[in-house]
């Protein structure tokens, strides 16, 4: 199994900053926006975007934590550990995840969201888009486009969970 670091800590920080600026530019009214991180690493990325928005715009946005496991079609998990600090009805939700691949996690996230309320709008921010979609899902905000083969894997590490920030590509061959 070969692993290669393709994004270091500084480049990852810049990608998150770029996503933050795009969110500011595309959302005229940020006070209706709720950031919703998809567990696990998407939550930490959403918090970092929240921190940058606070630094740049002096605006504190709510951050929710969305558990997609109970809504996935490829596993059976009963317990839902979703935590949403506000009612999402009518809100502009920005889902945040680390990697966009087939789109199945995002479909499950949307299913969970609509079980909680009726958002006004839902958009998607991902740190890495690696292609190979199986569902018609597209990210609105992308930190890095990293094309891969189907056998390769993208591994995003965040300091809060893994002790370091970096993105690697792993080839099991």
Curated annotation (Swiss-Prot):
Its EC number is 2.4.2.9. SUPFAM superfamilies: PRTase-like (SSF53271). Regulates transcriptional attenuation of the pyrimidine nucleotide (pyr) operon by binding in a uridine-dependent manner to specific sites on pyr mRNA. This disrupts an antiterminator hairpin in the RNA and favors formation of a downstream transcription terminator, leading to a reduced expression of downstream genes. It catalyses: UMP + diphosphate = 5-phospho-alpha-D-ribose 1-diphosphate + uracil. Homodimer and homohexamer; in equilibrium. This is Bifunctional protein PyrR. GO terms for molecular function: RNA binding; uracil phosphoribosyltransferase activity. GO terms for biological process: DNA-templated transcription termination.
């Amino acid at each position: 199994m070969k692993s290669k670091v393709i994004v270091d800590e500084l480049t990852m920080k810049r990608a998150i900053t770029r996503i933050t600026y795009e969110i500011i530019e595309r959302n005229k009214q940020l006070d209706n926006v709720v950031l919703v991180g998809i567990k696990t690493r998407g939550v930490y990325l959403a918090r970092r975007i929240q921190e940058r928005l606070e630094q740049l715009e002096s605006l504190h946005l709510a951050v929710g934590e969305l558990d997609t496991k109970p809504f996935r079609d490829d596993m059976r998990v009963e317990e839902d550990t979703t935590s949403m600090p506000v009612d999402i009805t009518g809100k502009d939700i920005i889902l945040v995840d680390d990697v966009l691949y087939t789109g199945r996690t995002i479909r499950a996230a949307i299913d969970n969201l609509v079980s909680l309320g009726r958002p006004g709008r839902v958009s998607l921010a991902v740190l890495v888009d690696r292609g190979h979609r199986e569902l018609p899902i597209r990210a609105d905000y992308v930190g890095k486009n990293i094309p891969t083969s189907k056998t390769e894997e993208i591994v995003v590490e965040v300091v809060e969970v893994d002790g370091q920030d970096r993105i690697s590509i792993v080839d099991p061959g």
